[in-house]
From Swiss-Prot:
Taxonomic superkingdom: Bacteria
Annotated family: Belongs to the UPF0178 family.
CDD domains linked: PIN_YqxD-like (cd18720)
Pfam (any one): DUF188
Name of the protein in question: UPF0178 protein YE1167
Length: 152
């Protein structure tokens, strides 16, 4: 099992949490992006640069993810595909998606797309705050503990 990161849109502060967790636990973290990324030197952190283009990084993650792998993404359709393949999807705010919540999120995303297409300004998400970072770290730790326990 390993951690995949949809890295193009992942906040740097969340990447830092992941880097520390990789070194602390020995869990492999792979950042997938369509641009070069800077990472600290570690045998547990790697980058995978893909071609530019719509959903190229997402498709690469879906192709490589395995059952019980963790994927860090704020992309709802990517999270849905990860769950469909038996993976675990966690957004950078610490929300762990489930088969039930992902359906709700997909419906809301489609509704908001319709609103934007009709010219209504919907705004974006709030800035990532300390509470979000703590929630992410807590959910990551839960997954790491469950995964490490399952491997023993």
């Amino acid at each position: 099992m390993q951690i995949w990161v949809d890295a193009d849109a992942c906040p740097n502060v969340i990447k830092e949490v992941l880097f520390r967790a990789a070194d602390r636990t020995g869990m492999m973290v792979t950042l997938v992006a369509n641009q070069p990324l800077k990472t600290p030197p570690s045998k547990f952190i790697r980058t995978l640069q893909v071609a530019s283009g719509f959903d190229v990084a997402d498709n690469e993650i879906v192709q490589r993810v395995e059952k019980n792998d963790l994927v860090i993404t704020a992309d709802i359709p990517l999270a849905a595909e990860v769950i469909e393949k038996g993976g675990i999807a966690l957004n950078p705010r610490g929300e762990r998606y489930t088969p039930d919540t992902i359906r709700e999120r997909l419906n809301m995303r489609d509704f908001m797309d319709t609103m934007r297409a009709s010219g209504i300004q919907t705004g974006g998400p709030n800035t990532l705050n300390q509470r979000d970072r703590q929630q992410f770290a807590n959910e990551l730790d839960k997954w790491l503990q469950q995964t490490i326990k399952a491997q023993v």
